[in-house]
Every structure is written in structure tokens, then in C-alpha cells.
Design a protein with these regions (language model features):
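ATP-dependent carboxylate-amine ligase
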Residues: 1, 5-176
């Protein structure tokens, strides 16, 4: 309780355990964090768990053309959350499905995760699964406002997408 009160007065840098706030969030807390290493993901999940009362649902992926050996480790660390939604995160020139397969190889409890390759759909799915009192952690991109796919830089901001999906789920506002 003391920790929760203290953290309520602290503001994190953009994209670091940044709370996504909308007028009607259905009692679901959504946070965006840049956590893109196994240690950072584990710490972000632990931080959410320390202040939350409900379940923690994490949405995450791993970047393409980067250290492939960390992917199964990220998968294993994600299971510190109550549930995980594995998705795409800057696949660059790699096949997003192959990246996801590498991640899932480290996840030994199939009942506690699912794969949703489209990042927007993955964020929407996590919010859909959440109940009042739960927290959703969208990890990996943090402050970034783009998605790298092949040679394309596509506009994509986890914070904006999460706010849109919260509004759609609980506020009746449709998104495109």
C-alpha cells in the first residue's frame, strides 16, 4: 500500500512504465515500457506486480536482425506475468513468424500465453482479456513511434494504440 502511494507521485520518463490514461479504462491499468531485454522485461513485470492487485498481462515481442539467442529467454521471463500475448516488434528483415517461434520455444506453459502476430491486435487482445483490477504491460517499444518492417518505417506508437484500444473496449469509441 505504501509503495503504491509513493509510486503514484513519481513520473517516469516517456515509455518507461508509462501509464496510458483514458477517461474510462474499465478499471484496467495499461502501462507501456521499453523493456526489450530479458532482465528489463522481468523487472518491468515485477514492478507492475508490486503495485497491482489483479493479474498482469504482458504484450511483447523481439526485434528482428538482433540477438536471436535472447528470444527464448524473453519468452521464459514473460511467464513471470500471469498471461502473455506474443507479438511482432520491429521485425526488420526477418520473418515475424520465425521470431515468434524463437520466443515461444522458451515458454513451457502453453495455457499461459497466446500468439497474435499483429501488434495492434495483440494490444487489443490483452485489453480484452483484462478484468477490472488487472494490469496490461505493453513491452518492447516504449517511447518509439514507429515499427520497422523490412525497409519501411511505419507509424506505430504503443501508447497511442493502447489508448485507442482502451477507448474502444470501455468507452465506446471506435478506432480505424
Amino acid at each position: 500500500e505504501d509503495i503504491a502511494r509513493a509510486l503514484a507521485d513519481v513520473s517516469a520518463p516517456p515509455g518507461r512504465l508509462e501509464r496510458v490514461a483514458v477517461p474510462d479504462d474499465g478499471g484496467v491499468s495499461v502501462y507501456v515500457d521499453y523493456a526489450h531485454t530479458p532482465d528489463a522485461l522481468a523487472k518491468a513485470i515485477a514492478s507492475i506486480d508490486a503495485v497491482g492487485g489483479g493479474r498482469t498481462i504482458v504484450v511483447f515481442g523481439c526485434g528482428g536482425d538482433r540477438d536471436a539467442t535472447k528470444r527464448p529467454i524473453m519468452g521464459a521471463k514473460a511467464l513471470a506475468a500471469d498471461y502473455a500475448v506474443v507479438t511482432s516488434d520491429n521485425p526488420r528483415h526477418e520473418d515475424p513468424g520465425a521470431i515468434i517461434d524463437d520466443i515461444v520455444a522458451g515458454m513451457d506453459d502453453a495455457a499461459r500465453f497466446e500468439v497474435v502476430p499483429d501488434r495492434r491486435a495483440a494490444i487489443a487482445r490483452a485489453i480484452e482479456l483484462a478484468r477490472p483490477g488487472d494490469a496490461v504491460l505493453v513491452a518492447g517499444k516504449g517511447h518509439e513511434d514507429y515499427q520497422l518492417v523490412g525497409d519501411e518505417v511505419l507509424a506505430f506508437d504503443d501508447r497511442v494504440v493502447a489508448a485507442e484500444e482502451l477507448k474502444r473496449a470501455f468507452g465506446g469509441t471506435e478506432t480505424n
